[in-house]
Amino acid sequence: DKISFALNQRLPEDIVVQGSCEVPADWHPRYQNSRKTYEYRILNRTFRMPTRRLDTYFYHHSLDVEKMSRAAVYLEGESFCAVNAQVKTTVRTIYACSVTKADDIITIRVTGNGFLYNMVRIIAGTLIQVGGGQIEPEQIEQILAARDREAAGPTAPAHGLTMMGIEYMEEKDIDTQGVV
């Protein structure tokens, strides 16, 4: 694919175009996707790991992953932000939210139809508070019902966040197989 090759010559090393296809002039990748998946990774151990400093958030206090997993289930469904947000609609659907741990890495994986500004980082910050015992898993329902940004946990730092993929709606004239 000549276009992918040309783009990859000019993009930074952490961004790769794996494929391309022709689309109608009015097609917009931001607004015509059906699902996005993000992962937020937390390095949960006593000491930092320099090799993971760019793709994980280092958090040295112990976190209860089981509590975080229980809380994550409450996030599935519709989520909202403050009423005065500067977007057309504040309603977003979370299809799946999970928390797993492998070695010293805790991964929060969130799939939804779209995300508000900092939404995944706010979810991560809130789940970190759950894991640290400041919030009980069951309180997530109250936080969502409040529809108030101040009720949720802090915004977690950006360097733990990675977009894992985008799924596009089926278009009869567009081949989106393998496009991320």
Spans of features found by a protein language model:
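Structured-RNA-binding interfaces characteristic of tRNA pseudouridine synthases
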Residues: D1-V180
